Amino acid sequence: MAVPKKKTSKSKRNQRHAVWKAKAATAAQRAMSIGKSVLSGRAQGFVYPVADDSED
């Protein structure tokens, strides 16, 4: 089984954690932006059914 030879330093651990947090923040920002565009009706890349009651 593979085991690390030395303990990872706090700075390396913090750097990796910061990268992970930055990626998560970017994904959250993108999701929020897409959600806002869908709710405001400005989204161009989504197709969803629209309830059309004029058929009666």
Swiss-Prot record:
Keywords: Ribonucleoprotein, Ribosomal protein. The keyword Transit peptide does not apply. This is Large ribosomal subunit protein bL32. One of its GO terms (molecular function) is structural constituent of ribosome. One of its GO terms (biological process) is translation. One of its GO terms (cellular component) is large ribosomal subunit. It holds the Pfam family Ribosomal_L32p. Belongs to the bacterial ribosomal protein bL32 family.
